[in-house]
A protein has these predicted regions:
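The conserved beta1-alpha1 loop
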Residues: 36-40, 236
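Alpha/beta-hydrolase fold catalytic core
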Residues: 1-35, 57-59, 99-100, 276, ...
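Catalytic histidine-centered segment of alpha/beta-hydrolase-like enzymes
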Residues: 266-275
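Active-site glycine-rich loops that stabilize anionic/oxyanionic intermediates
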Residues: 40-43, 108
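Conserved alpha/beta-hydrolase catalytic His-Asp/Glu region
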Residues: 156-210
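Active-site loop/oxyanion-hole signature of alpha/beta-hydrolase fold enzymes
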Residues: 13, 21-27, 49-56, 62-105
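Conserved serine/cysteine hydrolase catalytic core
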Residues: 190-253
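Conserved hydrolase catalytic core segment
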Residues: 100-139
Length: 289
């Protein structure tokens, strides 16, 4: 099957070549607002492959890979591996594409970026999907992520890689079988030049976590206020160690336009390919021109 997206690049303000997948949609679908999909800390554009294909049936979908991930350049200065810099990179892409109103799907770190972008320029987002993240994240989940990111593990075969993921993240996906772990491995890893299978990101993205104060969970309640009244779908894994039920309740109070869907027996983060989640996302977009 031919690819339904184009590999494109833009240049960051500090000269990095950054990659994004452009799904043009039917006939360019100019009449409908585009969708911007932003991935999590260690992820890349492949995370949204199935969702982007589905959404591109009716509208354009843009899936950037943040610096240090996938086909995007690695940064020479690891201090630039921060949500503020990622937001600046994405804002430059949006400006170059002439996009001033859009829908956002943000997973984990991508959701944090969504709130920062909303706070900096309110009123641009027609609808938002937040995947297992909120203005306040649990310290337990942050500690778990800090413990595995940047470890530089490698594997001799895809099956070994899948089993490695199952060992590390089995608590978040207790019902996954080997095929599903293989699928996750192929979304998050690549074959390196020496033939070993490695994670598809710069291990240096972990360095900012090691600096004093940087590992503290962010508090973005003020930024979240910029999304008050914006139609929102909050997806939460029932087993999530990053997004608590209490935070979900507070988010609903602050944004009455938010609907929540909880994915049973899944932790951080749902794939967004779950049938109920996919249906909810499509329903949200049905209300957006």
């Amino acid at each position: 099957m031919a690819a339904t997206y184009e590999d494109r690049y833009w240049t960051s303000s500090d000269g990095l070549d950054l990659h994004y997948r452009n799904y043009p949609g039917p006939d360019g679908s100019p009449a409908k607002l585009p969708v911007l999909c932003m991935h999590g800390l260690t992820r890349n554009a492949r995370d949204f492959a199935a969702l982007a294909e589905a959404l591109a049936a009716t509208r354009r979908v843009i899936v950037p890979e943040m610096r240090g991930r996938g086909l995007s350049d690695y940064a020479p200065d690891s201090d630039s591996y921060s949500p503020v810099t990622y937001v600046a990179d994405v804002e430059k892409l949006l400006a170059e594409q002439g996009i001033d109103r859009f829908v956002v799907v943000g997973t984990s770190m991508g959701g944090l970026m969504t709130m920062l972008m909303a706070a900096s320029k309110p009123g641009r987002m027609a609808a938002v999907v937040m995947n297992d993240v909120g203005p306040e994240v649990d310290a337990e989940g942050v500690a778990r992520i800090s413990g595995y990111v940047g470890q530089g593990r490698s594997y001799p075969t895809w099956v070994h890689a899948a089993r490695g993921l199952a060992e590390a993240h089995g608590a978040a996906f207790p019902d996954f079988d080997l095929d599903q772990w293989l699928e996750m491995a192929k979304r998050t890893m690549v074959v390196s030049q020496n033939g070993r299978i490695v994670f598809d990101y710069d291990m240096a993205i972990a360095e900012p976590f090691a600096k004093p104060g940087n590992a503290a969970p962010p508090n973005l309640w003020l930024a979240f206020e910029a999304l008050r009244g914006v139609p929102m779908l909050l997806v939460r894994g029932a087993l999530s160690d990053l997004l608590s039920e209490d935070t979900v309740k507070q988010m609903g109070v602050r944004n009455p336009a938010m609907r929540t869907i909880t994915v049973p027996r899944v932790g951080h983060a749902p794939t967004l390919d779950e049938p109920d989640v996919r249906a909810a996302i499509l329903a949200l977009l049905d209300g957006v021109e």
